[in-house]
Amino acid sequence: MTTIKAPSRWSGTRNARPQQLAGHGSVSPTAPRAILVRMDINARNIATTAADAPTTQAAPAPVVGRFAPSPSGRMHLGNVFSCLCAWLSARSQGGSIVLRIEDLDDRCKRPELAAQLIDDLAWLGLEWDEGPYYQHDRLDLYENALHRLQDAGLTYPCFCTRAELHAASAPHASDGTPIYRGACRNLSAKEIARRSALRAPATRLRVPTVDDLADDVIEFVDRTYGAQCEALATECGDFLVRRSDGVFAYQLAVVVDDAAMGITEIVRGCDLLGSTPRQIYLQHLLGLPTPHYAHIPLLMSPDGRRLSKRDRDLDLGELRARFGTPEALLGWLAGQTDIAPDTTPRSAEQLVEHFSWDVIRAHRENITITAE
């Protein structure tokens, strides 16, 4: 069983800049079995061989967090809470923040929404140190990573329709994604050619088979929710790395970007907790470092709904008009979520001294919030 636990301090260096992913070497065809090996995630770097590795221990690298919003609509209060926690965590540790706009999906390719998002972050006083970087400018990096996986025989074309994947009888993973049962895993070359003539396939990544059930568990320690584990074969299945329309899957793109940008700490909503084992698996296959993960509770409306851009719940247009100043909004939000002892207006900088992961851990459950 592989144990991949996030350490409290990081000794990696930020060798790869956002324009270039370090280590374009090949992936071993036996890589799925390599996940059975206990790894020192502080030392992994596919650009450095063991013989060339330095003998002296590097000083701990500074914390590098990130904002990674999608411009699919105006930011809502839940997005603000996530960005605020990421910013406060990094700043409280003397770290920096990278801004990345995740706009691969067609519905996110709206420059006016990206510009509004950037303006909202600046208005809130959540300053970033690098970026913004746009995923639509980084397709060559994702293509390179996918080719490495394909060359190692770790992927295969999948022709399953959405209706087939979402069949009522199909089991689903913790994040609602159908657990793929491998219908296209072992198609012959002739059958692949026949189906390809009818429709474009998606691309799936192989995970260790159920025969390796005792050994395919991905384990990590989340800063909020503690020890987590997932058996890839039974709780996830082979997962997409590229959609049938050619768009790179979220799991692959964020893994490539987080490594290239030197991200050491990922703070995001607990709805993405279930994605983490897949991302750690990809990091291992590609020889990339594993960041420290911290998932936070979601903000919920009084009727039990998760706040969403689609429903325009407490979006920043409404919130900016209502509160007038970023200090008033952030102070109110910090008081509502117990980051601060009360709702006194405070700037993001003033909230740094109040921030503690102990408070976030104390919540664990999602937080019901209103604009009253």
Where are the regions a protein language model picked out?
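Cationic, low-complexity basic patches in intrinsically disordered or flexible, solvent-exposed regions
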Residues: 20-21
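Short, mixed-charge aromatic SLiMs
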Residues: 105-115, 301-305, 353-361
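A general structural signal for well-ordered secondary-structure junctions
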Residues: 127, 155-156, 174-175, 190, ...
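N-terminal Rossmann-like or analogous alpha/beta NTP/dinucleotide-binding catalytic cores
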Residues: 40-173, 270-271, 275-288, 346
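Short secondary-structure transition/capping segments
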Residues: 137-152, 174-182, 202, 206-212, ...
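Non-catalytic terminal extensions that flank enzyme cores
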Residues: 26-73, 92, 97, 193-194, ...
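Active-site cores that bind ATP or allylic diphosphates and position pyrophosphate for catalysis
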Residues: 163-308, 315-320, 371-372
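Low-acidity, Ser/Thr- and Arg-rich intrinsically disordered low-complexity segments
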Residues: 1-17, 26-28, 33
